[in-house]
Swiss-Prot record:
Protein function: With S4 and S5 plays an important role in translational accuracy. Located at the interface of the 30S and 50S subunits.
Keywords annotated in UniProt: Chloroplast, Plastid, Ribonucleoprotein, Ribosomal protein, RNA-binding, rRNA-binding
Record-linked NCBIfam families: rpsL_bact (TIGR00981)
Subunit structure of this chain's protein: Part of the 30S ribosomal subunit.
Highest taxon listed in the record's lineage: Eukaryota
One of the record's GO molecular function terms: rRNA binding
GO CC term, one of those recorded: small ribosomal subunit
Similarity section: Belongs to the universal ribosomal protein uS12 family.
Species: Tetradesmus obliquus (Green alga)
GO biological process, alphabetically ordered: translation
PROSITE patterns: RIBOSOMAL_S12 (PS00055)
Gene that this sequence comes from: rps12
Protein name (record): Small ribosomal subunit protein uS12c
Length: 130
């Protein structure tokens, strides 16, 4: 326990909270350009080929972002919107690409959780009629 004199000499330091998505610079999303689209394998108990992209953001950062959903149309030089959110079994992947915006198409034939994968209601109705 410090004395009053010690507290006068130097006040208590505020503990600063470390951000989980520093590349977004306190923004909800950031635009970026795909530099490389590839697959990576997850950590130990899981097995898959997860689709990821290396993205250069408008904030100047270069990050690895996960491409959610089944199938995608992303290639090099595609303009994408990146949000925060890590992938637990991929070390170093702390961002997600937003589906259905800019150059990223929504997931085909998606009926449930459509808003998370950029699918409009009209698209699902058209697929149901066929």
């Amino acid at each position: 326990m410090p004395t009053i004199q010690q507290l006068i000499r130097s006040a208590r330091k505020k503990v600063s909270k470390k951000t989980k998505a520093p590349a977004l610079k306190s923004c909800a999303q950031r635009r970026g350009i795909c530099l490389r689209v590839y697959t990576v394998t997850p950590k130990k108990p899981n097995s898959a080929l997860r689709k990821v992209a290396r993205v250069r953001l408008t904030s100047g950062f270069e990050v690895t972002a996960y491409i959610p959903g089944i199938g995608h149309n992303l290639q090099e030089h595609a303009v994408v919107l990146v949000r925060g959110g890590r992938v637990k079994d991929l070390p170093g992947v702390r961002y997600h690409i937003v589906r259905g915006t800019l150059d990223t198409a929504g997931v085909k034939n998606r009926v449930q959780s459509r808003s998370k994968y950029g699918v409009k209601l009209a698209a699902t109705k058209a697929a149901a009629k066929k």
